[in-house]
Amino acid sequence: MEEINKYIQNSSETGGEIYNLIEELFPICRSITGNGVRKTMDIIRKHIPLEIHEVKSGTKVFDWTVPKEWNIKDAYVRNSKGEKVIDFKENNLHVMSYSVPVHKTMTLDELKPYLHTIPGNKDRIPYLTSYYKENWGFSLTQNKFDELCDDDYEVVIDSSLEDGSLTYGEYYIRGELEEEILLTTYTCHPSMCNDNLSGVALITFIAKALSKLKTKYSYRFLFAPETIGSITWLSRNEDKLKNIKMGLVATCVGDAGIKNYKRTKFGDAEIDKIVEKVLMHCGSEYYVADFFPWGSDERQFSSPGINLPVGSLMRSCYGFDGYHTSADNLCYMNKDGLADSYKTYLEVIYTIENNRTYLNLNPKCEPQLGKRGIYRMIGGGSDYPFDEFAMFWVLNMSDGKNSLLDIAYKSGMEFRRIKYAADALYRVELLKLV
């Protein structure tokens, strides 16, 4: 699958395109249901042919129930002078997601219990939700809150909460094998970028690249609201789970922070070894964390009755400075970070596609390489000239049990170095695929 290299080489340009998609999606007010999610899916469909699914409110999905659909047209708090002191149209984080409709006049003291701030970060608007308990509220900066004076305020939330449906999208690329790789991201957060428009845009462009390549494995891309969306998909697709070989959750991939990988619950699954091997040779700082049962949708895919090896490859992990606030905006995005995330995900996919197991066909002592002209057949180009050390590792460890990834770990070498050596040995019939 060497064709993927042209996309890796063009990652800097693609980082800018990913940013542009984030910028286009940023103004949309999304939640776990509603027209904002549908509008987001429509924009993604300009890039990849998403199949859209609608699941009716009230549908049982394991221990959960698909909630009512929420939509919002407008919301504001207006003082007696007619000034809007809080305006949803200025920032959609101003309204608690899933707020029920409100239209009343309130004093400041009556209104205060419904106003939410971050006293420690006075210039940030907090992101709040109330999905499963009917409630309403406004978020605003502490600075703005401190400016409010005793007055009568008109309070309006022009929203609807009624039977509808939950929307998710998926895109399936059929490979040579039915075994599939799951790449998933969530679509429910409103105007916040790292969490998680970065994941949405990244996975869109990963899918776009793979759609143009011939792959060994099949690939499934899932765009769904966090928690309830993955639970809904799992409950409706249990028959597909047997084909899922491994997966990754893409979130928080767009800032300038170091790369972070959260392992699967198994800790040593193939996807764990692949991601960690890629990170070892990425040339920059990274961090690997053991699994913990909170965070994003890896916790649903890792639940005992599902038990899929799904990790999460991020940059600054959730909880970063500005997380779930208005500070997670376009200014927080970093095009180089987006490009590096794209490149890293593609390198992981390259390793998944090329991690094969060989058997040495000349196992009694070392074969004579020179008479086979093998030094002229190495496949890695100028970056990987004749590499007898990599070849010795491949020949010695290719017993039909050790994969190329195993050999890369045991040798301490980059996976590509081992892979290119194996390619050369295979071409002169010193190896056969197991």
From Swiss-Prot:
Keywords in alphabetical order: Carbohydrate metabolism, Metal-binding, Zinc
InterPro entries: DUF2172, DUF4910, UCP015244, UCP01524_HTH, WH-like_DNA-bd_sf
Record's signal peptide: none
Region named Aminopeptidase-like: 1-55, 57-355
A Pfam family recorded for this sequence: DUF2172
Membrane-spanning intervals of the chain: none
Sites where the protein binds Zn(2+): 189, 195, 324
Cofactors (names): Zn(2+)
Free-text remark on how the cofactor is bound: Binds 1 zinc ion per subunit.
Insert: annotated span: 56-164
Keyword Zinc: yes
Keyword Translocase recorded: no
Gene Ontology molecular functions: metal ion binding
Region of interest (Permutated winged helix-turn-helix), ranges: 356-434
Assembly, per entry: Homotrimer.
Physiological role: The genomic context suggests a role in the biosynthesis of modified polysaccharides; this association with genes involved in carbohydrate metabolism is observed in several phylogenetically distinct taxa. Is not expected to have peptidase activity despite low similarity to aminopeptidases.
Record text about domains: Contains an N-terminal region with low similarity to aminopeptidases, an insert domain, and a C-terminal permutated winged helix-turn-helix domain.
Family: Belongs to the UPF0770 family.
UniProt protein name: Putative polysaccharide biosynthesis protein with aminopeptidase-like domain
